[in-house]
């Protein structure tokens, strides 16, 4: 009987040399241009001939492009370029899914370089290879056309490397690995049961099988960093020239501050969920409908909303607590202990 495997994401920060940074920037630009060109091809084919272009069609076009224009073949690995085309295909699939469901669709957009997150690779060894050090603490990434790049970080569990994403955020480069890991047997010290509900005033309120109450205070990450974030936002607003170096530096400072808050939120959620998962074999909670909970109160011109500012503030508080993140982490940790998770319907 084969061993059960789960896919996990683990992230390392990359430390390229100045020369490697130039090469990575060029790779990112080539993928951004490919994405936009593929989007333009789909739009043009539909508007001019009513023709729908598929992912397979665009892969065939890419093959011709790489054959006829050597600069495209030299720009990036073929399978990596196919992953960029796949990203666009997923964007269209999500668009049509929302249209079918009667939701606000959001047509796929052209991406500026600053809003293009990165590029991906699939099969390990095809244009890239990651070599971890002992215990998967730090390592090195060999990237075709770039060379060997130092990577720093720590994977919680080793496994078989399946795919990777090279990400550019806040002026920094990251490697996000998809790793197939053995389903861990997380230790559990007790076999209790609990049910909980999430809130804004108190982050978590719950009750155990022994009729004991559980409460976790809301850390209010936004309130902790509010003054600094507003100050950094104002610094960006005072520099209207989007091409100026001063504005770019201000934008990077703001993005770095937000990323720091996100890391603190994630670390806190991991600590809290690990502690709870070690105590309870059965956990029940109410299904979350965050989209409905954070819907804007602005209304329409004909029927304007009421207390719009108050609702916007509440939405910010809801999103700041990240209940979806907490629930996701809590669920998989409970299941890894061999426990049971129950999502109770809201109605």
Can you say where each PLM-predicted feature lies in the sequence?
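Well-ordered beta-strand positions in beta-sheet-rich domains
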Residues: 11-13, 163, 193
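Beta-strand secondary-structure signal
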Residues: 13, 87, 174-176
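A broad, structural surface signal
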Residues: 22-29, 33-40, 86-93, 97, ...
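Short coil/turn segments at secondary-structure boundaries
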Residues: 39-40, 44, 50, 99-111, ...
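Positively charged, helix-rich recognition surfaces that bind polyanionic ligands
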Residues: 3, 9, 22, 79, ...
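Acidic carboxylate diad motif detector
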Residues: 56-169, 299, 310, 316-320
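Gly/serine-rich nucleotide phosphate-binding loop at the start of the catalytic core
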Residues: 1-83
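Generic detection of short hydrophobic beta-strand segments and adjacent strand-loop junctions
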Residues: 12-14, 148-153, 214-216, 342
């Amino acid at each position: 009987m084969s061993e059960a495997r789960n896919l996990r994401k683990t992230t390392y920060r990359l430390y390229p040399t100045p020369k490697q940074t130039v090469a990575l920037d060029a790779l990112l630009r080539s993928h951004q241009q490919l994405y936009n060109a593929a989007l333009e091809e789909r739009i043009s084919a539909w508007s001019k001939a009513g023709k729908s272009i598929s992912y397979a069609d665009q892969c065939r076009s890419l093959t011709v492009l790489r054959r006829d224009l050597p600069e495209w073949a030299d720009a990036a690995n073929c399978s990596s370029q196919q992953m960029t085309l796949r990203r666009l295909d997923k964007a269209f699939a999500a668009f049509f899914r929302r249209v079918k469901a009667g939701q606000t669709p959001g047509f796929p957009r052209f991406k500026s370089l600053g809003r293009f997150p990165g590029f991906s690779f699939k099969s390990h060894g095809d244009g890239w290879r990651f070599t971890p050090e002992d215990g998967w603490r730090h390592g090195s990434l060999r990237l075709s056309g770039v060379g060997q790049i130092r990577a720093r970080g720590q994977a919680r569990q080793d496994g078989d490397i399946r795919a990777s994403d090279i990400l550019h955020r806040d002026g920094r480069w990251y490697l996000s690995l998809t790793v197939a890991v053995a389903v861990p047997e997380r230790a559990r010290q007790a076999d209790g049961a609990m049910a909980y509900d999430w809130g804004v005033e108190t982050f978590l309120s719950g009750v155990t099988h022994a009729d004991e109450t559980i409460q976790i205070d809301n850390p209010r990450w936004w309130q902790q960093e509010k003054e600094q974030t507003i100050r950094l936002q104002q610094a960006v607003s005072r520099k209207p020239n989007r091409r100026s170096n001063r504005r770019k530096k201000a934008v990077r400072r703001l993005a770095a501050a937000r990323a720091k808050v996100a890391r603190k939120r994630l670390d806190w959620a991991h600590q809290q969920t690990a502690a709870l998962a070690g105590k309870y074999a059965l956990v029940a909670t109410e299904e979350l409908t965050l989209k409905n909970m954070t819907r804007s109160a602005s209304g329409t011109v004909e029927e304007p909303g009421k207390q719009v500012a108050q609702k916007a503030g509440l939405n910010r508080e809801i999103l700041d607590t990240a209940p979806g993140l907490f629930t996701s982490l809590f669920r998989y940790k409970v299941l890894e202990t061999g426990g049971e998770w129950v999502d109770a319907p809201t109605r």
